[in-house]
Amino acid sequence: MTNTTYRENISMSVSGDTHMERLRLDAPADALTRLFFIFGSPIAHVRAPVVWSTLMKRYSANALMLPADVDAERFDTALAGVKGMANVDGVIFTMPHKFAAMKHADVLSARARRIGSINLLRRRAGGSWEGDNVDGAGFVVGVRADGIRLQGAHVYLHGCGGVGRSIGWSLAMEDIARLTLFDLDATRAHALAEAIRQDSKVRIEVATKAGGPDMRETDLAINASPLGLNAGDALPFSVDRLPPHAVVADVIMDPRTTALLHAASAHGLKVHHGRNMMNHAMPVAASFFGLDDAFDWNGASVQG
């Protein structure tokens, strides 16, 4: 699909009139508008629709990003309906759908096959659908942009679900020294460890309790679980045993500063906010969706 599809310099012929009317930036959707959806449940905390919509409006892209609150029970039916709409070009998945979405892809990127979940699905020429997962790539780029050193790092990852699995696999492709995994569902942690061992020789440990056997050697501690979304949630792990140089990262975007990050800051530790992952994954996702030429990433701020 050409870039002009997404720009609002499209002219439309008005029935019964001879002049051409240029579509206004704030005009409602028209018959040429391309649609993208974000599937999640709950969806209220997800920042991506606001950020994508802001960019689409700023750069006059004739496209809409629509949030869809879809629970697991209705997921397959809802996604099948969306895929059946000819003017839908892509879908983004957040919790809890990243594993379930895989079977809806006709083609998977090599990265998605290794990770075992997807957060992006796009319509290809001919009508087939391709899945990819850019969460981990966005996290790694964001961490590096924040000045956090990964080479030789000891990393603790709390949560091995859809986003955790992507982050864990992506970190293992970097030159880290050790990766400790924990999930309340131990089978998910062991499954991620096994997937990583197929592609990396990094030292991997599966912890039997939150925080792992010894946090005193941890350089980067990451929460990739839902803990912190809701007020009153328990901390995913204690920051008390982390060394003074450690960095604490959270993938949760709203609230921006979670209880875990508050505790880490109070303990004098550097923190890394969840919105960094989205901000650095967006250019990759835009390219995947064919929108990269519609946005000026050099001049765009994607702060959510």
Walk through the language-model features, giving the residues of each.
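Glycine-rich adenosine-cofactor-binding loop
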Residues: G40, N133, V143, I148, ...
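NAD(P)-binding Rossmann-fold cofactor-contacting core
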Residues: I176-D199
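Phosphate/diphosphate ligand-binding glycine-rich loop within oxidoreductases
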Residues: G16, E21-D146
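Rossmann-like adenosine-cofactor binding region
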Residues: R203-H272
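Short, conserved loop/helix-junction motifs that constitute active-site signature segments
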Residues: A29-D30, L150-Q151, D175, F237-A246
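Adenosine-phosphate binding glycine-rich loop
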Residues: V247, V251-G304
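Conserved S-adenosyl-L-methionine
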Residues: M173-R178, H267-K270
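Short glycine-rich anion-binding loops that position phosphate/pyrophosphate groups of nucleotides
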Residues: F93-A100, G162-V163, P226-L229, D254
